[in-house]
Amino acid sequence: VVFYATYFENIAISYDSTAAKVVICGTDGNNNHGYGIVGTVSGTAISFGSAVAFATGSGAASTSTSYNLQADKTVIIYGDTSNSGYPTVKIATLSGTSISFGSAVVVQNAAGSWIGSVYDSSNAKTIFSYVDNGNSNSSYGTIIVGTVSGTSISFGTAVVFSSKNTEYITSTFDSSNNKVVLAYAASDNTSSCRHCFWKCNIVRDGVGFSCGKPS
């Protein structure tokens, strides 16, 4: 089933368990605008609502989405190419097959790439990971905690989890051990750490992290 009738990239998907809908986000390859689309699954079939833009202007890059169960909101993070590639979050609200977005909130005032998100159900927080491409920690893997309230979000302090050239970050939440697990590739001039896993635990009232050693 075609859900977007032109070139579409940077695709990510999440599931809204309250609305029983999937949310797909990505970038139009022609105008680079970021769009969100709601999907309804019925048996082995799926249907879609209309695409709604969450990023216009120069568009979006490296999109990711996750569902925050406590807030009952879908969270979208993307690189805002209209704002120097800064990692930016918008909170989405679903109504049937329609989707709308709150105001943009910048995660950091520097470019980011390999952007991802995951929901920590133990702490009811949305966890964002990205490569910091613009600060003194350029190319370092970075993680930050987000607290969703309505269509707003606030952030804790960003923590570096990889002080090497980092890429291909992906993450999941281990509900048995209440840990965020990151998988990523990292390298330096000696290629001493190429494929790593790092387990992180939220501390300090759910706005900070402690991380174990990569293996």
Regions found by a protein language model. Give the residues of each.
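Extracellular, repeat-based ectodomains that mediate carbohydrate processing or recognition
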Residues: 1-215
